[in-house]
């Protein structure tokens, strides 16, 4: 292949050729000889006859020989040596290189930068990466059977290839043996046997090529027959799975799928846990698919993309993508999807299938060592028996939990694997979000999931809905539980001496009463203070009557509120007033409210007539004089009050 070079005229047309020739003549002769040595070697190399010995590759690589003419190269060298031109660097060319063979550098150079960076960096989410030593999940039962069948097919193909190669070697050996049995070879053997005693001093070290060939030919068929005899019972032990032809509901193409009968513990054991024979229980139905392998793979990828898309959005259902109401944002699914999921899980549990994958609960996991062999089946049977015994023991120890699980063994193992992988990756076990760096090694669950777990009520608490939606609230906005609390000891009575006015305690008054009492006490008129004080006492008595009537109608409503009991003398006076001024005319029992740590709610406003208020006012004046006479010995005992 001729290489084209740039001529002097192509570089610059205004160059004086005479000046170039003078420059070349001025170069010393020794330098020219050194430059012309590699050119002479190339000419000698071209003059030699072409042969396969000169090339390491095949004949097809001989056409890429470099052909360099001395005239052009000399002119180019003169241009390089001149001062007015820039040297042109030739490519890194090696003469006997095989063209078309990809090099590591060329492959990396042809790749886009994104792919180069992806191959250089390790993908942390790949299950097969050795960097994080993550374990892959257990595939479903049908995929396990498919993998086992593929392995069996590969083994059978390799065995067939080995048999074919062995048969061809046997035929070649037969041909060689027929040649050895010819009369010429027999004469050679006889001559060799007669010639052997002459070398008796060498002993057994003598080399006999014909005898050695016969000995090898006899040993080879014996060695080939032994593995064939061992392979035949193995092929008989591996039964072929029945296949069915079905049509994919998505692409409308036909595909073959094996009929898989799940291995249940009832079929392996002669008797069930209930003592019934396995013949009475029908065998499990085979599992078939409506989609082909290609469409199922696409569906899994599509659902995975949808989950990633909805996971980033907050307040959106993971399944249908609709917005979740604000009151139910603690859930991941919307109400309709949660209801459908509950119904689906209930139907699966009723049919005795796994709630998560809808597979058989008693399906065994195939062992990796002995897949498709009878030994593996026996181990699976033993493992099923052990599982049944453990489940029976667990049911005897914990009868409330139930003997069987709602989730199959494969899903439980996969959940453990998923949690272990998330823990290795530094993510939360529940929501799979990245943990804070400060929580590495201390917590396996993120802060949000921990707070959600603390907020959720325990399972042992009964009547949780009543506690949540209870209408009983105090004035501070807190829910009250129906509990009785022992009251503290009663404080000293709030009665004053003769020169002090009577001040009722806050627990005996409502909000409106306190306002009226403060306004009347700040008025500054001493003559009006006593009637107003009596007015307050009369209003308080009537409010207490209504409060007692409401307690009879709703005894449970006021069980959580506190009201301190008044002194004995005031209780007697209140009983007399209640009997005399009861609205219904029926004597009521004295108020003995249950105790609690919070003050009572304000009673409803009163609606009093003018005549009724005048009667209470006149009666309060009469009672005030009696109270002063009765309180004199009491104040002698409590002089500070």
From Swiss-Prot:
It is found in: Nucleus. Keywords: Metal-binding, Nucleus, Transcription, Transcription regulation, Zinc, Zinc-finger. GO terms for cellular component: nucleus. Disruption phenotype: Stabilizes opaque cells at higher temperatures. Residues 28-38, 151-160, 173-184, 216-242, 264-280, 569-579, 610-641 have a biased composition (Low complexity). Residues 13-27, 161-172, 193-204, 522-533 have a biased composition (Polar residues). GO terms for molecular function: sequence-specific DNA binding; zinc ion binding. A zinc finger (dksA C4-type) spans 317-337. Residues 379-400 have a biased composition (Basic and acidic residues). Residues 486-495, 597-606 have a biased composition (Pro residues). PROSITE patterns: ZF_DKSA_2 (PS51128). Induction: Expression is induced in opaque cells and biofilm, and is regulated by WOR1. One of its GO terms (biological process) is phenotypic switching. Residues 13-38, 146-245, 258-287, 366-409, 480-507, 522-550, 568-641 are annotated as: Disordered. Transcription factor that modulates the white-opaque switch. This is White-opaque regulator 3. It comes from Candida albicans (strain SC5314 / ATCC MYA-2876) (Yeast). The lineage of its organism: Eukaryota, Fungi, Dikarya, Ascomycota, Saccharomycotina.
